[in-house]
A protein has these predicted regions:
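Conserved catalytic or regulatory cores that recognize and/or transform ribose-phosphate-containing ligands
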Residues: 2-146
Length: 146
């Protein structure tokens, strides 16, 4: 799961953590994927504000990515960290699924700029909650968490 983590405020960062957990949950329950979102839990162990600890967390996330079969780009914006993960996925020739139509061309462009194949980027309109910035609200209402 590739989604925003870093934020200007603690409240926004907490919102991003909840969203990452919801994306992971949705991918597991509705898409039958063993999805991983290391950034949803790493902040419990490492502090994003300490550069050395952030570097450890980023390396760990990239190592998890290397073991993955597909990247799921969630939400409706790309953070710098997400861009780095997408570049890594392109270098690995990994299939990438995007859920937000507005990000689709942006991700394709980023992939081709890094010698990847834009055909490896797929737009999935069926699993639209993965494009929401606050997916947990939708999922709670859909009774997925109950």
């Amino acid at each position: 799961v590739c989604s925003p983590f870093r934020a200007d405020t603690r409240e926004q960062r907490e919102k991003n953590l909840r969203a990452a957990r919801a994306y992971m949950f949705y991918a597991n329950k509705k898409m039958n994927m063993n999805a991983a979102a290391p950034h949803a839990y790493m902040p419990l162990l490492l502090c994003d504000e300490i550069p050395a600890e952030r570097a450890i967390a980023l390396r760990f996330g990239l190592e998890i990515l290397e073991q993955s079969d597909v990247m799921l780009v969630c939400g409706n914006r790309l953070s710098n960290g997400m861009r780095g993960e997408i570049v890594k996925a392109a270098l690995l020739r990994m299939p990438i699924t995007v859920f937000d139509e507005g990000l689709y061309l942006e991700v394709q462009k980023l992939v081709t700029q890094n010698n990847g194949d834009k055909k490896s980027v797929k737009l999935d309109r069926e699993n639209f909650p993965m494009a929401f910035t606050e997916p947990e609200s939708y999922l709670e209402n859909a009774a997925l968490f109950k």
